[in-house]
Amino acid sequence: MECVFCAVVAGTEPAHRVLDDEVAVAFLDRRPLFPGHVLVVPRDHRPTLTDLPPADVGPFFLRVRRVAAAVELGLGAAGSFVAANNRVSQSVPHLHVHVVPRNPKDGLRGFFWPRRAYSAEADAALVAERLRAALAP
């Protein structure tokens, strides 16, 4: 089995599972940002979020939501950071959502890269129009 997350799902790769059901498997990240950093993966191999069938999105993200609540309740975290990469910066080509426990003054910035305003309102309007066109039925 080439996909390490498929191997975790299959039980052939060891992992500290925290959730395992018919939709998803959630397990501790081996290199966590903080203790309790969890990866949530769909049971079926899907490389990215856009590869997840629409009917599976809701059930999958209900599991992500449960894990986010668990890091707060079970670990006493003040909140969580929830994120997924699609292709760029995606270390394993199997959809995975990071749920990272957060606390005030934990040293992690909300975004890990510089943020910049649009140079002109017209630039923002053009980007918004391109996205609306891509979202049109």
Feature map (PLM): residue ranges:
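HIT superfamily nucleotide-processing domains
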Residues: 1-137
